[in-house]
Amino acid sequence: MNYTTICLAFQLCVIFCSSGYYCQAMFFKEIEDLKEYFNASNPDVADGGPLFLDILKNWREESDKKIIQSQIVSFYLKLFENFKDNQIIQRSMDTIKEDMLVRFFNNSSSKLEDFLKLIRIPVNDLQVQRKAINELIKVMNDLSPRSNLRKRKRSHSLFRGRRASK
């Protein structure tokens, strides 16, 4: 490696690190702006305990935690939607919403679109209710753990294989 390559690599590292730090600093600034707007640092906010943090502590497995996180993300999206016309905090909400969705959906726009589509489904619509009930069996089957079924099939076929070889 020559001197120019090393200098270029070093400069890129400095640029990427500082931009990441800048993004993180902006993220925290926007949260502080929202805390100030909602007066969320006031001592009475602690009354009744945390809203989400205790629940998150109870769910340890990554797949289980995603379920709870999806409900929490849904809550924040609804909260941000309620204040979408508020120009004072609009930029802060947009920044945090964008970062939250990137973190939760790992930059997958199709997952994000599906998630947003789901939370916007009107529950009081009769046609939606009918479709939901019609799809209920398939949804329930999809909720069933498939790993146990595969294990049973595999052990069953192994058992047959041993029996046949005798």
Curated annotation (Swiss-Prot):
<comment type="similarity">
    <text>Belongs to the type II (or gamma) interferon family.</text>
</comment>
<keyword id="KW-0051">Antiviral defense</keyword>
<dbReference type="GO" id="GO:0006959">
    <property type="term" value="P:humoral immune response"/>
</dbReference>
<feature type="glycosylation site" description="N-linked (GlcNAc...) asparagine">
    <location>
        <position position="107"/>
    </location>
</feature>
<keyword id="KW-0341">Growth regulation</keyword>
<dbReference type="InterPro" id="IPR002069">
    <property type="entry name" value="Interferon_gamma"/>
</dbReference>
<feature type="modified residue" description="Pyrrolidone carboxylic acid">
    <location>
        <position position="24"/>
    </location>
</feature>
<dbReference type="GO" id="GO:0002250">
    <property type="term" value="P:adaptive immune response"/>
</dbReference>
<dbReference type="GO" id="GO:0051607">
    <property type="term" value="P:defense response to virus"/>
</dbReference>
<protein>
    <recommendedName>
        <fullName>Interferon gamma</fullName>
    </recommendedName>
</protein>
<feature type="glycosylation site" description="N-linked (GlcNAc...) asparagine">
    <location>
        <position position="106"/>
    </location>
</feature>
<feature type="signal peptide">
    <location>
        <begin position="1"/>
        <end position="23"/>
    </location>
</feature>
<comment type="subunit">
    <text>Homodimer. Interacts with IFNGR1 (via extracellular domain); this interaction promotes IFNGR1 dimerization.</text>
</comment>
<keyword id="KW-0202">Cytokine</keyword>
<dbReference type="GO" id="GO:0010508">
    <property type="term" value="P:positive regulation of autophagy"/>
</dbReference>
<keyword id="KW-0732">Signal</keyword>
<dbReference type="Pfam" id="PF00714">
    <property type="entry name" value="IFN-gamma"/>
</dbReference>
<comment type="function">
    <text>Type II interferon produced by immune cells such as T-cells and NK cells that plays crucial roles in antimicrobial, antiviral, and antitumor responses by activating effector immune cells and enhancing antigen presentation. Primarily signals through the JAK-STAT pathway after interaction with its receptor IFNGR1 to affect gene regulation. Upon IFNG binding, IFNGR1 intracellular domain opens out to allow association of downstream signaling components JAK2, JAK1 and STAT1, leading to STAT1 activation, nuclear translocation and transcription of IFNG-regulated genes.</text>
</comment>
<dbReference type="GO" id="GO:0005615">
    <property type="term" value="C:extracellular space"/>
</dbReference>
<dbReference type="GO" id="GO:0005133">
    <property type="term" value="F:type II interferon receptor binding"/>
</dbReference>
<keyword id="KW-0325">Glycoprotein</keyword>
<dbReference type="GO" id="GO:0005125">
    <property type="term" value="F:cytokine activity"/>
</dbReference>
<keyword id="KW-0964">Secreted</keyword>
<dbReference type="InterPro" id="IPR009079">
    <property type="entry name" value="4_helix_cytokine-like_core"/>
</dbReference>
<feature type="glycosylation site" description="N-linked (GlcNAc...) asparagine">
    <location>
        <position position="39"/>
    </location>
</feature>
<keyword id="KW-0873">Pyrrolidone carboxylic acid</keyword>
